Amino acid sequence: MTPRKPFWQTKTLAEMTVPEWESLCDGCGLCCLVRFEDEDTGEIIPTRVHCQLFDERLCRCKDYPNRKKTVPDCIKLTPYNIEDLEWMPPSCAYRRLHEGKDLPLWHPLVTGDPESTHKAGVSIRNQTVSELSFKDAEDAMDFVATDLMRDRGDDLYEPEEG
């Protein structure tokens, strides 16, 4: 008997159920970083500054269901806007699947371990500062972090022996 392929290998993003869609999030936190756009080049510049609702220890939104009330410009990812979100990290599951790639080896759906993103060193856990730390939003430019956007989707995953 042939084993069934996982849902992300058999369904398009638009065909996924809400729980399947939500489970694609690996909890890296990279989408919760404050970014700036270079007015001259249009380049997106990420920083090590996170959204006020981001829990830096858990790498999750503190109020996900109601986040738009506090952060009106928070972008909700959908199968219909993912292609317009070029600022998403190349290792993001939503972006990778949209581009026809598979999930990274370190993704929790692949490993079965919800901590695998952190163990693989892909998340921003405890590496950022809250946007609430600044009086002037432009001060976040002192924390530019282009290194965080490198593609880590094909990185090997070698879990530590327990």
Swiss-Prot record:
It comes from the Bacteria. Disulfide bonds: none annotated. Coiled coil: none annotated. It holds the Pfam family CxxCxxCC. HAMAP family: UPF0260. Belongs to the UPF0260 family. NCBIfam families: PRK05170.1-5, PRK05170.2-5. This is UPF0260 protein CCNA_03385.
